Amino acid sequence: RPSLGIIVRRGQGENGGLVVEEVDPDSACHRQGIQPQDIIVAANGQQVQTFADLERIKRTLDVGDSLLLEVLRGGEHLEFTVTLMDQDDF
């Protein structure tokens, strides 16, 4: 099953999205520079407000596929392309 190697919670306020709580040090997200407190607002161009939104997008992909994450960090809009890994690799 594809995994990003992060733990998230639902964001608050006008930006919403998903707040990254933890990033597995062995994950592609970590290698690409995603950090705790980053806010994921979109994945592959689709708005992300809930964990279910992110899971729905991930279900269309396989291990080894790329996922474009749009992230807010300190008011700055960033984009990261991460490769989905098998959740058993963590």
Located regions from the model:
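C-terminal recognition in membrane/secretory proteostasis and scaffolding
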Residues: 1-90
